[in-house]
Structures are given as C-alpha cells and as structure tokens.
From Swiss-Prot:
It is a single-pass membrane protein. This is Small integral membrane protein 11. The gene is Smim11. It is found in: Membrane. Pfam families: FAM165. Expressed in brain, heart, kidney, thymus, liver, stomach, muscle, lung, testis, ovary, skin and eye.
Amino acid sequence: MNWKVLEHVPLLLYILAAKTLILCLAFAGVKMYQRRSLEGKLQAEKRKQSEKKAS
C-alpha cells in the first residue's frame, strides 16, 4: 500500500468538507433569493388587486 497517499487524506477531507459547505451556502442563498423575488411578485399582485377594488 502506498503510505504517501494516506498522508494527504486529511487535506482531501478538508477540501471536500469546504466544497460541500460552499455548495450548501450557495444553494441556500439561491433559495432565499427566489423566495424574496416570489414574495415581491405576490405583494405587487396584492397591490394591483386592492387598487382595482378601490376604484
């Protein structure tokens, strides 16, 4: 067995953990952005409907 490879395993695990964390944060950020844009559209739709009822 190649023992030199085993010396690099902790570094590879740290890189994998960092990559996973970055991907999770990016995914959460995209979901937050989508939710905010959807809420904005719903607010605009409610405003339009309330203006129609008022006039």
